[in-house]
């Protein structure tokens, strides 16, 4: 999908980009406003490539849009918004069993033993279980600023599906199957989203300059140069979500451009990235 520039100059076109490869992440999706707008843009890209609206809607939900948020209610609204947007292009979409990659971030704080003798016997898979539980401590507070290592999360989820047990199960085994296993699968699914790299990452990050508790400790330890405000942390983190030559978009306060608190952020962007568009909003926009 290509729009000719107004000046008529065409410097470079990657003719081999497929629509399904244009994966779009909003790591602070809220109720999904940005995802819904991206859906319409992606729909035009698919239609330009010869897809029907019905097929494109399914492809966008399955392959293109990814969203995360720590707020369960906001995530439910985002889920609903994406599904209704797909439904607007395909009347039977809700009956097709397609689930969007729109997730409420979960944490592992209340999880007990994750390995059951006789049910989980694969050492590599058990190591992933322990990694997930350790990584997702306090993530209802930390959200998507955590970093996750890429692992075989698809294989891990398939492995969990095969841990059904045979014959008579103990109460502990039954509890693992009914409660622990679904949570591990949910953690693996969000780990897969957080570990991936995206051609496009766009968000309206949270604004918070008085950070306290576990979040303050984590930000100080991992994002000290960008800790003046939570939006600054997310600005940096979003860049880490992007593939090389990918695009990041933000709706943030404009103070990062001027005051000393955000000097390290400005230096990082200027020295390592390229700004294609910069719009200074009216103060009343916030």
Task: Give the role of each language-model region.
Residues 60-61, 97:
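Short, solvent-exposed loop/turn segments at the edges of secondary structure
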Residues 107-183, 190:
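Basic, amphipathic N-terminal segments
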């Amino acid at each position: 999908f290509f729009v000719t520039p107004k000046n008529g100059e065409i410097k470079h076109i990657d003719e081999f980009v497929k629509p399904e490869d244009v994966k779009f992440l909003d790591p602070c999706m809220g109720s999904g406003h940005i995802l819904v707008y991206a859906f319409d843009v992606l729909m035009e890209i698919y239609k330009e490539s010869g897809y029907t609206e019905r097929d494109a809607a399914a492809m966008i939900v399955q392959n293109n849009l990814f969203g995360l948020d720590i707020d369960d209610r906001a995530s439910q609204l985002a889920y609903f918004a994406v599904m209704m947007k797909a439904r607007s292009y395909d009347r039977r979409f809700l009956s097709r069993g397609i689930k969007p990659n729109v997730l409420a971030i979960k944490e592992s704080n209340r999880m007990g033993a994750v390995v059951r003798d006789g049910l989980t016997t694969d050492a590599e898979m058990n190591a992933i279980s322990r990694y997930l539980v350790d990584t997702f401590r306090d993530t209802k507070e930390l959200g998507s600023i955590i970093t996750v290592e890429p692992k075989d999360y698809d294989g891990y989820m398939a492995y969990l599906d095969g841990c059904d047990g045979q014959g008579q199960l103990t109460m502990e085994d039954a509890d693992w199957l009914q409660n622990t296993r679904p949570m591990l699968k949910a953690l693996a699914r969000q780990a897969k989203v957080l570990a991936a790299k995206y051609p496009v990452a766009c968000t309206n990050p949270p604004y918070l300059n008085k950070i306290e508790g576990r979040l303050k400790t984590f930000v100080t330890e991992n994002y000290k140069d960008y800790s003046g405000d939570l939006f600054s942390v997310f600005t940096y983190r979003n860049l880490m979500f992007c593939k090389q030559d990918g695009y990041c978009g933000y709706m943030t306060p404009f103070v990062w451009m001027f005051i000393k608190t955000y000097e390290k952020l400005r230096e990082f962007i200027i020295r390592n990235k390229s700004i294609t568009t910069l719009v200074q909003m009216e103060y009343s926009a916030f």
